[in-house]
Design a protein with these regions (language model features):
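Polytopic transmembrane helical bundles with strong interfacial aromatic enrichment
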Residues: 1-152
């Protein structure tokens, strides 16, 4: 039963993560208004929490369920998937820092100022994250089918 719950929570958190990223992409456009700016901050926090749940449930599946830790540690698709997840996490830092820099303006009830160049960069990073998140299931499927097993 634990394996099913861990798998369900893992998949659900991935769907939530993707939905939040799509929502971020949809809401981030100039000119910003106060309500959308506040929503973007909240959505980004939820996105970070969803990423944490993805990571924790994924680790639970690797350590306690699935094919055993040894299988995953000796599978290049697993390493590619983890590397891709880490890369997505690094990219997500840019929009997060932009949103965190809005705190003072939002506390003062002001709309944050965002240059067109910075807005374009944030949008491009979010689009890149969306693309990379779509590659994660490819590595998962290949790994589950036995591709990438290193040495015997």
């Amino acid at each position: 039963m634990g394996q099913a719950v861990a798998a369900y929570l893992h998949f659900l958190s991935i769907f939530v993560l993707f939905a939040l990223l799509v929502l971020e992409h949809r809401l981030f456009k100039l000119p910003l208004d106060l309500e959308r700016a506040r929503s973007l901050v909240r959505i980004d926090i939820a996105y970070g929490l969803a990423a944490g749940v993805v990571l924790l449930t994924g680790l639970a599946r690797v350590v306690w369920y699935g094919k055993g830790l040894d299988y995953y540690l000796h599978n290049s698709m697993f390493h590619a998937k983890m590397g891709l997840f880490a890369l997505i996490a690094l990219f997500s830092g840019f929009p997060t820092f932009v949103f965190l820099n809005w705190r003072n303006a939002l506390k003062a009830g002001r709309v944050p100022e965002v240059s067109p160049g910075k807005a374009k960069a944030v949008i491009m990073v979010i689009r890149l994250e969306l693309l990379l998140v779509l590659l994660l299931p490819l590595f998962a499927v290949l790994m589950a089918r036995g591709y990438g097993v290193m040495g015997n």
